[in-house]
């Protein structure tokens, strides 16, 4: 699966897509493939403050539990509740159905400091 070019990426394998000034966040195809079959997703409540490089939730796979790290600072405005009943969306559709949270960014410039798809692909090929 190719890395979408209309998103930015963190070193912790989260993606950010800006829509109407808000940041939609999820994990990358690379991350879900490394984790294996996802069986549970824990996400913050709407209104929660997230801080860049700090955990905001977790994903549990058949292999392990892995923390989700916020790529930016901001306030959660929406949570993907579909993942409560269908955590497999993370494996099946990491960039579409499996977005995790929508955030009102504290500073939109932080998003520009994240990696482009080309930079992210380069990083994951080195792993």
Swiss-Prot record:
Sequence ranges assigned to domain Lipoyl-binding in this UniProt record: 22-104
Any matching Pfam family: GCV_H
SUPFAM superfamilies per the UniProt record, alphabetical: Single hybrid motif
Free-text cofactor note: Binds 1 lipoyl cofactor covalently.
Record flagged with keyword Protease: no
Cofactor(s) for this UniProt protein: (R)-lipoate
Cited InterPro entries: 2-oxoA_DH_lipoyl-BS, Biotin_lipoyl, GCV_H, GCV_H/Fam206, GCV_H_sub, Single_hybrid_motif
One GO cellular component term: cytosol
Keyword terms, alphabetized: Lipoyl
N6-lipoyllysine modified-residue sites: 63
GO biological process: glycine decarboxylation via glycine cleavage system
HAMAP family reported in the protein's UniProt record: GcvH
Assembly mode: The glycine cleavage system is composed of four proteins: P, T, L and H.
Family: Belongs to the GcvH family.
Reported function: The glycine cleavage system catalyzes the degradation of glycine. The H protein shuttles the methylamine group of glycine from the P protein to the T protein. Is also involved in protein lipoylation via its role as an octanoyl/lipoyl carrier protein intermediate.
Protein name stated in the entry: Glycine cleavage system H protein
Organism: Bacillus velezensis (strain DSM 23117 / BGSC 10A6 / LMG 26770 / FZB42) (Bacillus amyloliquefaciens subsp. plantarum)
């Amino acid at each position: 699966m190719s890395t979408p070019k209309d998103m930015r990426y963190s070193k912790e394998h989260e993606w950010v897509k800006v829509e109407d000034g808000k940041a939609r966040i999820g994990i990358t195809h690379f991350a879900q493939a490394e984790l294996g079959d996802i069986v549970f997703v824990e996400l913050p409540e709407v209104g929660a403050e997230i801080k860049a490089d700090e955990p905001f939730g977790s994903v549990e796979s058949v292999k392990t539990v892995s923390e989700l790290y916020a790529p930016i600072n901001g306030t959660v405005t929406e949570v993907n509740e579909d993942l409560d009943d269908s955590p497999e969306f993370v494996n099946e559709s990491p960039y579409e159905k499996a977005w995790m949270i929508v955030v009102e960014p504290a500073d939109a410039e932080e998003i520009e400091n994240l990696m482009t798809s080309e930079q992210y692909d380069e990083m994951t090929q080195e792993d």
